[in-house]
Amino acid sequence: MSSSSRKAHFMHTNAVYWPNYRVYNGDTPGQLNYGCINRVHYAFANVTADGGVFLSDEWADAQAPCDGVQGALGSFMHLKQRYRHLQVVLSIGGGDSAETFPIVASSAVLRDNFARSARGLVEASGLNGIDIVWEYPCTPEQGRDFLALVAAIRIHLPEDRYLLTATLPAAKPVLQNIDLRQTAEYLDTLNLTAYDFFGHWSHKSGHHAQLYAMSKDETSGAAGVKDLMSSGVPGKKILLGIPLFGRSFLGVAGPGHKNRGAGGKDGSFEYNQLPRKGTKEQVDKRAVAAQCVGADGGFVTYDNPDTVKMKATFCKQKGLGGLFYWSAPSDAKDSKRSLIATGFKALHSS
């Protein structure tokens, strides 16, 4: 089946990430609304130093009771039969594989091992393909190895049968290491993580998923898209990332200020917990960012339905492929507050 015919059901891609650890929170794949989702990135599989690819949690992936079947991955494979438009790809990497990716990608033998191992896992599980999440190619040499890796994968996962995607940050120091035009030739989509621009690690508060920067020294989703497209990546291959979580800062009422640390769990709140009780939600239309401020001075920055609509409009204006969301279980259950549903409707509205 060709890449174009696989995507014929939707004019734009509306993809979600689903981390396997959410099984332990009582979340299951069957809880999602597949009327507005056409791709799931199942996260994460890990990489060994010899190039092997393996599922990271056998119980969560293949044994836990999920929607009447065994394992969250098993549930997605079952749902794929019910929703014929649904693609499920295996996201390989993340933080646990940050140290092994540079080793594997630097060797032709290990790159081939990786590609063969990934294909075996894809075929055994009935997946549509894989997503490379190397955090991150930090030098020009690693950038060249990244290109060599995706080229090696395409030999074993040909584009007429399998999806191949990669996830990269909207950060010039990373993107400038990679020949993006050549890399994009091997990919179905390049997923741009247009969030985490600010957080508990930052010296000042800021909108963590802003579409437009508020000063020259800040990055933004629009800047990341510009970097990709000016480097030769076709707009239709770019997915803009939407966070289903907010970043918090204590002791400030907005962006651009020194703060007293972070509130919430690890400095963040799941989107379905926002806006916080007792706060008023506001939208910064210039940055395209939502926020709420608590009585304790806690400033939380995130996306809401209004900002997602604006980002979807941006995608259509720039000719981008669509949106993706990290991560699906954190979305609001109310369809009017759901960012996934809002994004789908906005992408497909005239």
Predicted regions and their residues:
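Short, acidic/polar
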Residues: N20-G35, S106-A124, K172-T183, G221, ...
